[in-house]
Amino acid sequence: MASPERYQERESLKKDISQDDGGKKAAPISFGFSKTLIKVKSGKAEERDYLVEVEGKELKGTKPVEKPKELIIPLIHKNRWYRQDAERADKTSEEKTEEPSQVKQDTVESQAVKELIEESQKYQDRWKNGPQSDPNFAIPLLMQNQVPDGFEDGDKVNVDLRPESSTEADYERVPVEAYGLAMLKGMGWKQEEGIGRTFKQDVKPIEHQLRPKGLGLGADRSAIKDLEPGVPKRPPKPGDEKGKEEEALVLGPGGCVQVLAGAHKDLYGKIEGVDPDNGRVVVKLAIGGKTVTIIQHSIKLVTRKEYDKYSKDLSRLSKAHKDKEREKEREQKREQEQRLNGKDERGKTDRSREKDRDQKKRKHRESSTDREKPPPAKESRSSPPAPSWLQRDLRVRFIDKAFKGGKYYNSKMRVEDVLTPHTCVCRTEEGRMLDDIRQKMLETIVPKNDSDYIMVVLGEHRGQVGRILKRDREKCRAMVQLDRYEERVFTLDYDTICHYVGGTDH
């Protein structure tokens, strides 16, 4: 309903219009306001899932639950360059109204990219089909995926060839804790399977444990043990009051604690609240009734019996009581030292008695008729020496980091002469001779080429020369054909063969 003021304005407006028309009767003019009520439609109704079956700890409903798939991020062996000209062909007619100079420039750029790709393909085909191709020659992965010239070199970097970045949905699909593991799986890593080319071993990674909240660097980690729940020291005996020894220490509201450090040191209190995010505890002190906030690792959980006995005992805080406690600690240390000294003295007397007894037995044994037979001596059980595998003309790897300050570490050399079963003379690739090289400083090498010769250094066929026919890198084995047994094939471990660079009968 219109207000009286608006009604008066409307009447005055009608009078003015009638006067301007010379007293003529004018058509009535009316004003109105329209208001529409828009009802917001409710969202999509929630779909309900009904329980159908229970198998052990698994619940089955009407909607099938998708099992989580193994997350694997595949390794990119070859870059896929982003071609903008292909996307431009799919654009609508509105985008074709661009300036002619811009369209011409885009066409020139796409043509340049096409020519660069064709030229690189020609070089690659020429290298593959060339007369002198080394099968062991490998191009690094970064060089294979190198960006064509003219795009990301110089002062101005053009990233038009790069693909579009990942979306937020892609990031949400891959959890942070599973990202590194997914990349390793894409590179071929498998759980409980060793990695490497020659000696595969399943090495357990070092998992760093998260430091508890509120415990900064340099803090005493042993304080965490005091917060562990109490465990009965011995089973209860008949007649013991049940529940005294079995009282569990809980870090929660109502728990009894003693402050170990800070302004309220040695005071007792009860926990009123716990802030796990910041690692702090709200404690109400027994003396004074003050509520304070203390770091979690500065308190010690105590039993109800200890709390009732010492919580309001003010004599504990006096200087005389502290001096008495220190004196008790000193007496306990003295008693421990005396016990240790007494044990040492008793041990000395026992050893002297045993020595005299052994001397008497030795004299009696010498005077007896069986003194010619020596008494059975207890030999120290030392580990058996490693089997010798050194042979002349073997190509080996030096693995001793301490020799000559690590100068020859991880370098390859040739065995020139074998002095003893475990020492030899080696020649480096530069021609330098190294004397008195021990076997434990060296490691066998398996040749990469099948055309190279190998020698069996351990086992039944030690000293035989042959060639590798097939390799099993997963099990670190090789199928070998020896020159002496041309019609037979042997399967040998990598540890029993070594690269041989000496002369052969062929």
From Swiss-Prot:
Cellular compartments per GO CC: nucleus; spliceosomal complex
Gene3D superfamilies, A to Z: 2.30.30.140, 2.30.30.30
Coiled-coil region: 303-346
Disordered, as annotated region: 1-28, 83-110, 211-247, 310-389
Entry GO MF terms: RNA binding
Subunit architecture: Component of the minor spliceosome, which splices U12-type introns.
Assigned protein family: Belongs to the MOS2 family.
Protein name as it appears in the record: G-patch domain and KOW motifs-containing protein
Organism of derivation: Danio rerio (Zebrafish)
